Amino acid sequence: MIKQIGTVAVYVEDQQKAKQFWTEKVGFDIAADHPMGPEASWLEVAPKGAETRLVIYPKAMMKGSEQMKASIVFECEDIFGTYEKMKTNGVEFLGEPNQMEWGTFVQFKDEDGNVFLLKE
């Protein structure tokens, strides 16, 4: 099952400007910085020692980004088992777990239509 809130995504116009804000002005450390193409990276920042991180994600890489809100990512150790258990319990998923370079993900909805991400 879910073990913790892993990340909260914040969608930004300028990833480098946001990176400077969170690291230089707020004082967060860079927890991850992996290239995702020529213009962006998978960027996580967090207070020193924190387990939950902010993902600073460029809006330009998201379709419909003008309507994007901050999102929560729940981490688990067995995404396929967790997916099956939650699905059996009546949770609505928006697809099946998808393996990507930086982890395996699947989206699900709560009963009010809020969308969350599950990650292994």
Curated annotation (Swiss-Prot):
Superkingdom, natural source: Bacteria
Domain VOC: 4-120
Pfam families assigned: Glyoxalase
PROSITE patterns xrefs: VOC
Classification via PANTHER family: GLYOXALASE/BLEOMYCIN RESISTANCE PROTEIN/DIOXYGENASE (PTHR36437), GLYOXALASE_BLEOMYCIN RESISTANCE PROTEIN_DIOXYGENASE (PTHR36437:SF2)
Annotated protein name in UniProt: Uncharacterized protein YetH
Organism in which the protein naturally occurs: Bacillus subtilis (strain 168)
